[in-house]
Amino acid sequence: MNLSTLQLSKMPAWARWPLFAAFGILVLTLVQELGQNETSRLTATSTSQAMLRWCVPILLAGLGGLFSERAGVINIGLEGMMILGMWFGAWGAFNYGPYWGLLIGAIGGAIGGLLHAIATVGLGVDHIISGVAINILAPFAARFLSSEIFTQYQGGSITQSPRVESAGDLTLPFLAGGWGTPNLFKTMRNADIPWLSDIGSVLLGFSTRISWATLIALALVPLSTWILWKTRFGLRVRISGEDPWAGESQGINIY
């Protein structure tokens, strides 16, 4: 390990990640300059907005996989659980509003997780087989429910829900000009300075019109960290996956 790597490893996490992000944007800037017209949108504000929006399903699936792995359960049925959550979330948002839709969607995904738990832990089914079965059945269940319910409404079909109300969005004040405040990132973007303007453009996309649903999903990351590593429940989850017999010896009913 050389001196620069050692110094980097000693930096706190809050300082390392912005440094990695700035280096990543520098790479995008160089690729954009070399590619010219073919890569002109790499650091555009709309690109980073889309990146943030589309990372949410992957983030939620990753958090679900984290809890499963820590509990000692191989969960490859996450895609099917996400599909169930998506359908129930759309149904809930259409009937009761966006925030009820988020809650009902979480319950729908949890139903898929419960099926996986019953099959693997309760009935002893192989984890892989159970996960594959959920991934196969969930799309067909969603398609059937859509054909029976969503097709009865305008805009609905077997592949999409009727139009639902937005959960609303937030533009950060001072950084992106929210609430009529100055717009720091836009000023950086318009400065026309290599790298600095690209950083401003990317950060402007990350801080402009952020859906409240996205903010809730991002908040689940530190919340999950706290639950798994700072609470009694998290300790029990981790010991169940890492050393079940040690958990049994401490009075945790695992088997």
Language model: regions and residue ranges:
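Transmembrane helix-bundle core of multi-pass membrane transporters
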Residues: 139-229
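Membrane-helix/interface signature in polytopic inner-membrane proteins
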Residues: 223-255
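Residue-level recognition of pore/gate-forming positions within transmembrane alpha-helices
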Residues: 82-87, 109-110, 135-139, 221
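Structural signal for membrane-spanning alpha-helices in multi-pass inner-membrane proteins
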Residues: 30, 61-65, 89-93, 117, ...
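Alpha-helical transmembrane segments of multi-pass integral membrane proteins
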Residues: 49-53, 101-108, 209, 213, ...
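Membrane-interfacial amphipathic/re-entrant helices at transmembrane-helix boundaries
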Residues: 2-60, 88, 99-100
